[in-house]
Curated annotation (Swiss-Prot):
Keywords: Cell outer membrane, Lipoprotein, Membrane, Palmitate, Signal. A lipid is attached at C25 (S-diacylglycerol cysteine). Part of the Bam complex, which is composed of the outer membrane protein BamA, and four lipoproteins BamB, BamC, BamD and BamE. One of its GO terms (biological process) is Gram-negative-bacterium-type cell outer membrane assembly. The lineage of its organism: Bacteria, Pseudomonadati, Pseudomonadota, Gammaproteobacteria, Enterobacterales. Residues 211-230 are annotated as: Disordered. It comes from Xenorhabdus nematophila (strain ATCC 19061 / DSM 3370 / CCUG 14189 / LMG 1036 / NCIMB 9965 / AN6). NCBIfam families: PRK11679.1 (NF008674). The gene is bamC. Belongs to the BamC family. This is Outer membrane protein assembly factor BamC.
Amino acid sequence: MATLLQTSKVMKVAGLSLVVFLAACSSDQRYKRQVNGDESYLETPPLKTLNIPGGMILPLQNGEYDVPSATSTGAVGKELDIRPPLQALALLTGSRIENSAQSSKLLLENTSEYSKLWSQVVSLLAKKNYQISQKDEAAQTLTTDWITWQRADENVPYQGRYHVSVSQQDYQTTLSVSSDGLKQGEQDITDPAAIQRYNVLMLNELAGGLSQQQEEAGQNNAKDSGALTVQSGSDNTGLAQIIVRAPYNVVWNRLPYALESIGMQVTDRTRSTGSIAVTYKGRSSSDWKALGVEEPSVREGNYKLQVGDLDNRSSLQFISEKGKPLTQSENDQMVAVLEAAFSKSTDK
C-alpha cells in the first residue's frame, strides 16, 4: 500500500510539473525567436599578444593569416533574433515588390484595373477597423492610428503607425507603406530590422485584402461573361499561342473548370504571375463527343500554362516539361477544345 501511495504522489508531482512547464511555454514566446543550443562561445577569451622569451630568434613575420581585430555591435546569444525576415507578397496581378529599410512598396502596372486603387485601400482599412488619423485625398496619402499586431512569437504585442500612399508615374502605380512609429508596450522601437518587419506585415495585410477584392470581382465578372471567343495566335517570337477575347480576370476564374473538363488537372497556380501547372491525362472518346470536338493530339503529361494579360483579351500558351510550346497544329486543336470547354462553363 505504501508503495502505491508513493507511486501516486510521484505521478501527481510529475503531472503538476508538466502542467507548469506547458504553462510557462504557452506564456513565454521568446523561445520562438532565440537560439536553442550551446552558448559557451560567448565566454571565449579575447586574443592575446604572444609572449616571446628573451633571446629566442623567430622566423620572419607573415601577416597573411593574422586575425583582424573587430568590434561587434550586433546582438548575440539569447538577444539574437533568429526569425527569418518577413517576405513581402506580390499577390496582385502584374505586381512586384520593392523593399528597403525606409519603406515597402507594391509596384503595379498602370492599367484600368488599378485606377481606383486609392479608394480600395481606404475602404479596406475601414473594413479591417484600422483607424485613420490623417488623410489627404488630393495627394492620395494617409497616416493610420496605432495598429496592434497580435503575434504568437511576441510576448508583448507591437503597435505601429503607418504612412500609406498611392502614386502614379508613367506606366506604374505604386502602393507604399512606411513607418510613422513603432513601439512594444511603452518602449519605442528604433531597430531598423523590426521597423522593416512590421512595414512588410502592413503591406501584406493590404495586398492580401486587395487580392481578395480582385478575386471576388473577377468571379462576379466571370458569371456574366457568357461564352468566350477563342482563336489561334502567336507571340512576339512567332511561337503559337491561344487568344481568348475576354479580360484576364474573367479568363483566370473560368480556366480551372474549363481545364478540368478537358482532362487537365490544375496542380498549382499563381495569379500574380499568370502561371498554372497542369497534368493532362486526356478523356474518353465519349467525353470528347459530348463536348462536341475531336480528341486533340497533345501528349499526356505535365504542362505549364502561361496566361497573359492583353487588356481586353488574354493569351494562353502551353509549355511542356522540356520547355517546348505546342506545335501550330496542336495549338489550333486546343483552340477548338477550349472554346467548347468555355461554352460549357458559362454558369460555373
